[in-house]
Amino acid sequence: MDFSLTEEQELLLASIRELITTNFPEEYFRTCDQNGTYPREFMRALADNGISMLGVPEEFGGIPADYVTQMLALMEVSKCGAPAFLITNGQCIHSMRRFGSAEQLRKTAESTLETGDPAYALALTEPGAGSDNNSATTTYTRKNGKVYINGQKTFITGAKEYPYMLVLARDPQPKDPKKAFTLWWVDSSKPGIKINPLHKIGWHMLSTCEVYLDNVEVEESDMVGEEGMGFLNVMYNFEMERLINAARSTGFAECAFEDAARYANQRIAFGKPIGHNQMIQEKLALMAIKIDNMRNMVLKVAWQADQHQSLRTSAALAKLYCARTAMEVIDDAIQIMGGLGYTDEARVSRFWRDVRCERIGGGTDEIMIYVAGRQILKDYQNK
């Protein structure tokens, strides 16, 4: 088994490091975080340099790359301390290529190329329907050749920043109850839409919002994918999202580890660097083991994606392990850095707030255990 990177991958990671460290120092991200400002300059730079468009076909303004390369790049972005949770450009385009119309794909690609930002927010969750999307009550109805969407969504990431939303809505009278949900392409500026940002522990650089839809009018052509297939399309989206979650968690953990190791060499206590103490050495050694495990897990699942293998179990386990373990590593980094680690002057405190979301978004830890555990039992039922 060859663990070495290709020359192209080495050059890509070096270019990411140079771009971020040269143009976007920690002070930039700290200011955006403290002010709740979306870092448009950063996103524009990623798009202009092709980083946020990796894996997207050239015809849509992207750079072809396999999933292993994409995950290496994503880990490198967060390893540099940058908010990798903003990068869903390629994911948006991939979803539209899989089940969107030609016009929806065109809008997605053009919007992303023009702004550098993802084109749409995914509006799934509702006050009474989080992990259980089947309980969603937002409806779509037809009248006089138009379609009207009514309901409330919550915890919608990027609803304030992105120009469009993909809204999961229920047919109140479906012919087949198993095919009640359909995705709709909705312009966020349409009449009847009200967006209220929520205040959060972390992810301050990107809004998370309540979205109210009151008789929002859309066209039949705004249907995304086949009618009644919305839930299945969402499930496809989740598997790749979970791998992405795992990759960016891993990068943040690695950045926190490196900050803690440098601090342990520099901080003098009782006449010597604190890194000379065996308790600090033990923490760093265990952190290094965890990071190695996380990286290997992410790259294995990415390889499986490149081989067109099912990611149902492996992506769920990767997200579960990496999100939990990243929190452990970052928490240990804060402990090593002491009081400084608990202040906004140290970026590990931002990582601690931001990575905590990874244990919730894209499927909670508990749902990941359920998804993986159920599939494992099924796989061994007749063995």
From Swiss-Prot:
Catalysis: reaction(s): a 2,3-saturated acyl-CoA + A = a 2,3-dehydroacyl-CoA + AH2
GO molecular function, one term: flavin adenine dinucleotide binding
Keyword Flavoprotein among UniProt keywords: yes
Keywords on record: FAD, Flavoprotein, Oxidoreductase
Swiss-Prot/TrEMBL GO biological process terms: 1-butanol biosynthetic process; fatty acid beta-oxidation using acyl-CoA dehydrogenase
Domain of life: Bacteria
Family: Belongs to the acyl-CoA dehydrogenase family.
Protein's recorded name: Probable acyl-CoA dehydrogenase YdiO
UniProt-listed Enzyme Commission number(s): 1.3.-.-
Record-linked PROSITE patterns: ACYL_COA_DH_1, ACYL_COA_DH_2
PANTHER family attached to this UniProt entry: ACYL-COA DEHYDROGENASE (PTHR43884:SF37)
One Pfam entry name: Acyl-CoA_dh_M
Cofactor needs: FAD
Entry-linked NCBIfam families: PRK12341.1
InterPro entries associated with the record: Acyl-CoA_DH_CS (IPR006089), Acyl-CoA_Oxase/DH_mid-dom (IPR006091), Acyl-CoA_Oxase/DH_mid-dom_sf (IPR046373), AcylCo_DH-like_C (IPR036250), AcylCo_DH/oxidase_C (IPR009075), AcylCoA_DH/ox_N (IPR013786), AcylCoA_DH/ox_N_sf (IPR037069), AcylCoA_DH/oxidase_NM_dom_sf (IPR009100)
The protein's enzyme class: oxidoreductase
Annotated GO CC locations: cytoplasm
